[in-house]
Amino acid sequence: MNFRGNHDLRRAGGILQGQRGTKSSGTLENTLCDNLSEKGDHLISHMASPVPADPSAFVSSQELERHIASIEQQVERPIEGIFGPNSITWRINRESALFLGAGRAALLQLAHPWVATALDQHSSLLSKPIARFHSTFRVVFTMIFGTAPQAFRAARSLYQTHTRITGQLPTDVAGYAAGSRYEALQMPALTWVYATLIESAIIAYECVLPRLTPTDREAYYTESKIMAGLFGIAPDTLPPDWTSFQAYIRQMLESQELGVSDRSRIMAHRILTGAGSWVPIPRWYQSLTTEILPSRFRTEFGLSFGEARMASAERARRWLPHVYATLPAAMRYVGPFQEAQARLANKPAGFIARRSNKFWIGQPLLPFNE
């Protein structure tokens, strides 16, 4: 692989090998969605840490099976899944409000040249964005709310899908040269995708619900490492705690590991406008997504954020918590969570759960049953 950003990689090792980054006053604990006047940069400000050390590191099927075996040993009741109803993972991911962070997570994933090129060349993101949305959430929600066997089958299915995703970068992007080879099982890209999902979920949650305590945030991050194992990422290679995780994100956002190409810019604009789908994207959602993006990527994606957009995002932050608080549980909680609740009560998923599942995962029940 022809990689031009090796100076960033040589600084690797500290955070991902268990060393803490330097902490300062600007942490996620002090900011997030209800204090976004700094437009996304404060979300991970004043932190510095290394990025993944080895761009040639890959996930093997043997490693994935080791992670699955390790998780399986910790599961007490397989019917409850790998997290269970008392976990903070269920508490956060049951909220439909997490959709508020989906655009942000998607754009930050597109900021990784390997991920963006893989999505462009191997997915239906542009032609069938709803199908892509459903395929992503089918896997993620099954890992979270399915039974343990379902979660493990989802992990193996995802791995098999990733084995077929290879190619070359068509142009120079950030620290990568044209012709550089990518594979979906490369650890740095998988780690970045995982990180965007975890961070964006908390940002979205706190847009409409009370801010998580530092203890809860730490617990959520700790539990998230279990799901990382289902991606094939060894938990002990991840930052050891939430503060270090912030530091890793900060380093990534400032590094040449990330960069936006013309093609990924087009993909991002299509996502934010709902092009190719029957679902219109509200202006307020576009504005809020733009606001909670780090300023570097607002610029690189070519997203305008003038006074009108700022006002739109500000209004959304004011009314969203009030509207969300009035939603009945059937609308507030995602279908996969409702299905899991029914399963634990030894009942079939009800009509509302099935309809909600159709929206979130494109089918009435979680997949990967025997």
Regions of interest found by a model, annotated:
Residues 8, 31-34:
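Short hydrophobic alpha-helical segments enriched in small aliphatic residues
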Residues 12, 22-27, 37:
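Short linear motifs in low-complexity or flexible loops
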Residues 32, 40-370:
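Mature, function-bearing regions of proteins
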